[in-house]
Amino acid sequence: MRRALGATLWLAVSACRPTGGTPSGFTLLFFDHSPAAALAGRSWVPLPDSSRLVAFDPQLRIVRTLTDPRLNTPVGVVPYRGRDLLVTEFTGAGVVVDTAGRVLREWPGPFTASLYTAGGGHVLASRSPYFVQPLAPESPTAPLVQLLDSAGRPTDGLGQLHVPSSPFLLGPTNAGALAADSGGAFYFGPLARDEISKYDRTGRRLWTTKRGLRAHETDPVFLPARGVRLPLALAVVNVALAIGPDGRLYALGSEDSAATRLRVDVLDAATGRILETRRLGAGRTAVAVDARGALAVFDADSLLATAHSPGREPFTPAFALPDLGGVVGDTVPLGHFAGRVTLVNFWASWCDPCREEFPLMAALYGEFDRKDFEIAAISDDVDAGKMRAFVAQFRPPFPILVGGGRMKATYHYRGLPYSVLLDRRGGIIARIFGFGGAAEFQRLHDTIAKEVRAP
């Protein structure tokens, strides 16, 4: 998986341990670079690198884990309508799930990539700070944020854009952190400018606060082209915003352009006055408040390490699909692969990354014995002729199963290629979204080799 906050944000944050012994009565505000969601006595956090949501109790013990193919790379989560969770995907999709993990709805978002928040009965979207895409020109009269209905459709635009020198930089310049309170006001912190502003529910700016994070500010600019790529220079300032259980605004920001020196500021939501500042060290952190409203900082990896492993979830639903090279009318069931580590790969002839992936899959297939490892490559082509032409071109050594264009609706993946690595008992070892090149396949090889050796 590939992702970035702004140009550079997926780097280490701070790690310091709170004083005062065992944690008690905490609400998480931020976990690593993402805002957390407080709902029904639990703090929910997104874990983009493991494609899941995790819930902590007030003692910061993990009490629930949610996974779904539609939770591909979750980077943000907020409470939604008092009982559900609204998840921001790295690509900008919005996914509404209940606390049992059922996906209730999803939408693509109003911007090239969106970040969502909810409060005061409203859903709002800003341009995402996690996936900044230049070269998508926008009108300077476009709104800063979009008000959405319950289906994720824009109903109104609020706030004014900061207009940079090039229309191609409107998106990166106006991407940023977003939060909303129960009264319907919203707070916006531009990714690359040292300011945080509060707006009322009509989009009127109420106050703006600067935190002194930058001595000199510049808008994002293009660097000299590198081949077909046009790099973007962007200094990360605002990372994430959250409304605490005490009604105060908490701002996670960066004191250096690469977001390696982070700090948390506590602001009076009514006036924007900074009440407290806490600087964070090196490493991944979890920032929380206790029942008295005091800030506490924990090592995020240590909190995750205390989780009891529930075991691997099964791959469902089980399939029984025709083998392109088999006898007409026969099907190959998932159970056929039992007893072997298996890579279930979904692909299609129209998928360009799939074309890059197939030679690497063929090489991977040849590196293991058939009693230990197998690949089930499932085509999701509707056009059987194009599927057969693809197979004739690449001549894969592994089985090709025919999905007939029904696989996305069955397994709910967002794009292709999509792969699921299964252990010998059919439990999910890993989900792989997209194509990560040779480096990803080397990691996959190492994971398979380790699993093959496991008792």
Predicted regions and their residues:
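Sec-dependent N-terminal signal peptides of Gram-negative exported proteins
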Residues: 1-16
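Thiol/disulfide oxidoreductase modules built on the thioredoxin-like
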Residues: 390-397, 402-449
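Thiol-based oxidoreductase modules, predominantly thioredoxin-like and allied folds used
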Residues: 372-385, 396-405
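Short pre-active-site segment immediately N-terminal to redox-active cysteine/selenocysteine motifs
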Residues: 340-342, 346-350, 415
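Conserved redox-active cysteine motifs that mediate thiol-disulfide chemistry
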Residues: 346-363
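N-terminal "domain-start" segment that seeds a small globular fold
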Residues: 306-334
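Hydrophobic beta-strand anchors of alpha/beta hydrolase catalytic cores
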Residues: 343-344, 375, 419
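Eukaryotic scaffold repeat domains enriched in small/polar residues
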Residues: 16-317, 412
